[in-house]
Each structure stands twice: as structure tokens, then as C-alpha cells.
Amino acid sequence: MPTHDSHRDTPRARNIPELSTSARSASVQKTSVQKTSARHAKPTRRTHRRLLAPPLAQKNGIDPIQLVLPHPEELPEELAPGGRAPATIADYLIARFYPNDPQIIHSRFETGEVRLDDGTVLTTSSPYAPGERIWYFRELADEPELPSDMPVLYEDEHVLAIDKPHFLPTTPRGSYIAQTALTKLRVREGNPLLIPIHRLDRPTAGVLLFAKTVQARRPFQMMFQHRLVSKTYRAVAPVPADPTAAEQALGAEGLRVRSHIQKVRDVLQVRQLSETECVARGVEPNTLTTARILETFTPDPAEAEAWGVEPGRPWGLYDLAPHTGKTHQLRAHLNLLGAPILGDVLYPRVLPDGPDRPEHPLQLLAYTLSFEHPITGEPISLRSGRTLSAWESKNSAVWEAS
């Protein structure tokens, strides 16, 4: 059975008219490097997750949001004076979200873009009914234009694999709604059903999978949940200062890094206990990464300063194999070794907010992804066509051969 490799020059399987029981031919394109918080209500009140099909179609690749109207006792005094619910849905939406610009909400009602689950079109006079679920489109803030180069690495009628650039979020979140891989791909591919099967952090580039149909979502999600996927990442970071750790990382088997990682809501960095701390506290490690250094070099002082690394310290090109998939696992593990990834604005310390630095992106790349296709049974092997800018002028033969 053939293996799909993203460096083979085979045509893309596009414009597929019907489903079949086997995957079509792969798309394989090698790419060049491109240098380039809730007020008071319960957290489940306003969400993108849903079991029902929304009564409004996507707009420019963006889903409508759903909102369950709170009961008066759940509302602050300014929205429900004396415990009385607002008279109309429009009154509530304006008071809660757009008190200084009510026309935003009025325009949604005027265009029929506020609806109930069953598709009933609401008006500005529709009465407020606690517990009722409504759907509407939020007003989008201006977003800075982010990279859009997402070459297709593989595609069949079930799944789409792209090569995500640095700085592009995977899904809408926070201040990024339109400028995300999901939204841009839905528009570009003309497929409102696209859903990411896994995620990459905004600063991380590389291989990213999307399910193309509702039926394909669960098989691929289960594939990741049951860890039936082999992943490797590339990173550029200092060589560990500890001689033992450095020696193991430079060895053929690599260095196995274990820790306990916990993601805390609204905290940018994860909380991490080293393996030694886990033993002392009686806590089981929940993460494992194999870190192998493929090559080392010592940058000149100007380059080291530009990346915020002390001059004279050698850097390494890392091959990272995560055996678990916790938030920020690779970034946290290299930081644990005293070798934070170049360009990281969260580790070892959170840097002040500022504009993206296209010339100094996080030096982390989701490099390869291999799995047995959960629907067709075909072995799939994908590889990013990108490199890392801190390594570009170094030994390319090491990159290609590893």
C-alpha cells in the first residue's frame, strides 16, 4: 500500500464529486519559507460549541454565535433593575454588549440575523424570554492582516492537510476571528463544514489537519485521542547547559523529558513540575517528549543578541517527538531544560504584548505527521515544506536528511 509523502510531486485531489471508499491521490506541494474575557454569566452561556445546526448560514467563513437568555436573577442590577427582566431581546443585547452603539444590534434585526433554534426570525419587539436560545452574528473588531499562505500537503474527500504559517491562529479565539486558519480556509475552499482535527499554537507553523465532512470528524478525532498518530517537530534552541542532559540529547536515542503540566484558566504559562518535583510531591508525570539534537552551532554575537540569547552559547537543531499532547508541552519541556525555544514570548518569562515580529518567529515547526487513514486504511505520511529562519543559513543537509 503506498505511503503519501508531502515531498512527492503528485497532483492534488480537488473538486471531488462524490464519496468513495478509498482516498484519492494526495496533494503534495513543497513550499518556500514565508518570512513574513466574559462579564458575569455562566461560561456555557455564549459558545461556538453546539449540538444543533445553526439557523443562520456562515458569513465569510464565520459561524453565528448562540446565546441562552439568562434568568433575571442571573443578571446584574443594571441589566435587570429590581429583578425585572428586560422587556425585549433587543433591549438586553444592546444593554449588555453595545450600549454605546445600539445601531449594531438594530441592524442585525433589520437583516433577519437574529433567530431562534427553529429559524424563527426575531424583531426588535420580540419579548425577552429567559432560557430561550438565540443566534446572531457578533460585531467583529478590526483585526491585523495575518499570513494566508497555507499550501495543501494532502487532500482527499475526507481530510485536508495544510502547511500553517507562523502567527496564524488555528481557530477563532480572543481578538482573532476572521484572521484564522479555519475562517480563511472555509472561504478559500468553499467548504463551511471544515473543522480542525487538532490544533497548533498561533506562533507554531507546520502540518495541520482539517476534517472536510461531518462524517469524517469523529474517526479522525478518535485517531488523535487514542494517540494513533506519530508526530515530530523541529525547533531551534540553546543546547542544555547541564552536561548530562546535553550528552543525552546529542545521543542517538535522545533525551526523554517527563513532567507534570497543568493549564490554568486565564494564565498564559502552564504550571509545570519536573520529574524530580513529581517524585517529591507524589504526583505522576503526565507528559513525555523525546528531544534529540541533530546538529549544533554557535551563532555570532549579533545574531544571538537579536534572538535574545546570551552570546557564546551553542544552539541546537532539535527533533522533538511528543508522546503526549498537553498545552505548550514542547515549549515548556525545553524551558525545563534551561533551553527555551528561540522567539518564545511566553517562556521562560512572559514578554509584554507587542506587534508580531515576522523576522523572529517562534522557532517551532510541526514537521511530520504520520498515521493510518481511519476511513480508508491507507498509510499517510506528511512533511512540512517550511524551515526555521534561525537555521536557514546553516547545514541544510542535516535538515533534509533527518
Predicted regions, residues:
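RNA pseudouridine synthases
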Residues: 2-24, 35-402
